[in-house]
Amino acid sequence: MPQTDTAELVVLLDDDGRTIGSAPKAQVHHASTPLHLAFSCYLFDDAGRVLLTRRAVHKRTFPGIWTNTCCGHPAPGEALQDAVTRRVREELGVGITDLRCVLPDFRYRAVAADGVVENEVCPVFCGRAVGQVHPDRDEVADHVWVPWQHMRAAAEFGWAISPWAAEQVPLLDAAGIGHRD
């Protein structure tokens, strides 16, 4: 069962990426969001397509926007790979194989139209989805499998996907991820 915003803690970081504490997720996403630990995940199918998701419209940060497969926060003391596996299962109902961290040092800051700020050290993972997608509608409004070149095109426009995905896609391209197209 997914944690609620009131129960979920995020790991706070200093500017060097060291853990300095934790805080309730519901209290850290605002105009002065402190630096905290997160992750992004891109899942591919056997045809090499990537799973895009549309964030639920009631989410606190970047509601209703199309983005990479899954994002989330590890709990204090939770290994990042375990957090990725947990959140993908909770949000999308699928398992993962071949999970690997491909951009371990990714960091970004993005300001939403409503002034809410994301400020994260956000390692990026890629893997293969196992099973049929059954999204939790409290987290995911929609989903679609697309060829990588469609993800690349969305990133080039910037406004078509989340700001973090728009930054991550060229880095993933440079790392050779998604080049089956």
Curated annotation (Swiss-Prot):
Subcellular localization, as worded in the UniProt entry: Cytoplasm
Keyword Cell inner membrane: no
Single Gene Ontology MF annotation: isopentenyl-diphosphate delta-isomerase activity
Domain Nudix hydrolase as annotated: residue spans: 34-167
Pathway: Isoprenoid biosynthesis; dimethylallyl diphosphate biosynthesis; dimethylallyl diphosphate from isopentenyl diphosphate: step 1/1
Residue positions binding Mg(2+): 91
E.C. number(s) listed in UniProt: 5.3.3.2
Any Gene Ontology CC annotation: cytoplasm
Listed Pfam families: NUDIX (PF00293)
UniProt-listed InterPro entries: Idi_bact, IsopentenylPP_isomerase_typ1, NUDIX_hydrolase-like_dom_sf, NUDIX_hydrolase_dom
Keywords: Cytoplasm, Isomerase, Isoprene biosynthesis, Magnesium, Manganese, Metal-binding
Top-level division of the source organism's lineage: Bacteria
Any one biological process term the GO annotation gives: isoprenoid biosynthetic process
Function: Catalyzes the 1,3-allylic rearrangement of the homoallylic substrate isopentenyl (IPP) to its highly electrophilic allylic isomer, dimethylallyl diphosphate (DMAPP).
Entry similarity comment: Belongs to the IPP isomerase type 1 family.
Name under which the protein is recorded: Isopentenyl-diphosphate Delta-isomerase
Species, as recorded: Mycolicibacterium vanbaalenii (strain DSM 7251 / JCM 13017 / BCRC 16820 / KCTC 9966 / NRRL B-24157 / PYR-1) (Mycobacterium vanbaalenii)
